[in-house]
Amino acid sequence: ALRHRTAALALGVCFILPVHASSPKPGDFANTQARHIATFFPGRMTGTPAEMLSADYIRQQFQQMGYRSDIRTFNSRYIYTARDNRKSWHNVTGSTVIAAHEGKAPQQIIIMAHLDTYAPLSDADADANLGGLTLQGMDDNAAGLGVMLELAERLKNTPTEYGIRFVATSGEEEG
């Protein structure tokens, strides 16, 4: 009988105590996002399909969090150096993703990370496997994008004094 009462008491305590959902540890969301971006969008060089797809993915993430978000394209060019030292212009169209969080004051805080990976600027770069389609870019710069997306996730319902603009850029190596 004592054993039954103890079991009933233990079972009752289980239903009385509040259930606490475990919240993700700081950095978990950033880690998941960075790994997703690096895995599913390797070779995110400015103007490539992978760069455009990753920009759209980031825009969608911001929109799912409730931010106004859009993609703006820009044209740029850079000098590519061939093996024979001949230089030529390469034209690219890059993408920038911008998401907005309004604040009380007109001033803004800008949080930036670049979404593209390194593009080979010469045949020597390509030969040394610097950049290119296989580069996953965890440190260039999926990790920065992950941190930016976690900040956006954590701030989405927080009133702020200043507005916040999250900006994911591309083309910084090319100019």
Language-model regions, residue ranges each:
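Bacterial N-terminal signal peptides that target proteins for export
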Residues: A1-L9
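A non-catalytic alpha/beta surface segment that caps or lines the substrate-entry region
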Residues: H36-E102
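Active-site-proximal beta-strand/loop segments in catalytic clefts of secreted hydrolases
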Residues: F40, R72-N75, H101-G103, M112-D116, ...
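Bacterial N-terminal signal peptides
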Residues: A8-P18
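Acidic/histidine-rich catalytic neighborhood of metal-dependent amide-processing enzymes
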Residues: T93, G132-G175
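Extracytoplasmic/secreted cell-surface and envelope-processing proteins
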Residues: Y80-A82, A119-S122, E174-G175
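Stable alpha-helical elements in mature extracytoplasmic
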Residues: P26-F40, A50-Q61, V97, N141-V147, ...
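Loop/turn elements at helix/coil->beta-strand transitions in domains of secreted/extracellular proteins
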Residues: T32, M65-Y67, A105-I109, T160-R165
